[in-house]
Amino acid sequence: MKRRRRLTLAGLLVSGLLLAAVENRTVLVPGNAAWTDTGIEVIQGQEVEFAAEGTLSLQKGNPQADCGPDGYDLRTLQQPLTDRNLGALIGKVVIGITVIKDAKTGQEKTDEAAEFFYIGARSRVEMPAKGRLFLGINELVIGDNAGEFTVTVVTDRE
């Protein structure tokens, strides 16, 4: 009896350790925001699972412009991934950010190095680089968008 209890306790401890190695986070991605910071640092080759739901309007007030996380079956040059549906859920890993200050005007210009990838409604993606994970909409003209996607992000802590 004592041995069985020890084995059960050991099994629970191992299960707890395995569960602790997985991080599950819910992120709201507004359709009218350029990018949403997940707060998650990833490494190159790490697999991350995404499950998204919700509806966006790619043109507020136009019911014909509604789409889910897989996007609207249209491609334009005004989107980060031109070979994927307009309005689809996408991601990027920001590798580095450089801030340059103009000596004459004093204005700061931000330049970032990032790797982009498609997500859609559900996918498992191997991270293309080490850096910070952001989620966004596959569209560059976002001022007239409405709605949001709710995205569950599951990562293995490495």
Regions found by a protein language model. Name each.
Residues 21-158:
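Acidic, Ser/Thr/Pro
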Residues 10-25:
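Bacterial Sec-dependent signal peptides at the C-terminal "C-region" and cleavage site
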